[in-house]
Amino acid sequence: MEEDKRTFLRIPTNLRGRIRLLASDKELQLFREAPITSTSVSVMELKSAGVNEALVNALAGIDRKLDLLISVHSQDNLLDDFPHAVQIGEISGAGVKLTSTLPLEIGQMIECVITLTQVPIRMAGVIGRVVRNEDVSGVPGWAVDFTRVRDRDLESIVQFVFQTQRDELRVKMWE
């Protein structure tokens, strides 16, 4: 995230993530979040088909709960694939600053999965290179530049950054 090549807004944050170390920059990305699709029947479609509104609401509630259960199950697999926990202290579309008890080296390639929201769960996966060491309050920290990000994951990160900025502006407006 060098100053001269920064084209994304960087914000302070407190997100959790998981990483795995890569042997080279040629490794394929392991994390893949399913795209948001509209394969399920929408509430509006059920209502227009004449389904009772109480039943429509019950079915929508079940759908949300199933999504949550699937997310919890996916988290278990994530812990196996990405064994190292990290805290994300800053994020942008170009990289992150993270802290971890796992020692990293400058030049080390990592794959990182960032939990952007918890309910509903929204994650983004990136591959990046550790570019510098930056300890935070005595905890080892590193700046990581993204080297490969899928468009969908980049869009999720950028949306998170903008939503966070909007939320902060609204809070300041009421102070």
Residue ranges and their predicted role:
Residues 1-175:
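Structured alpha-helical
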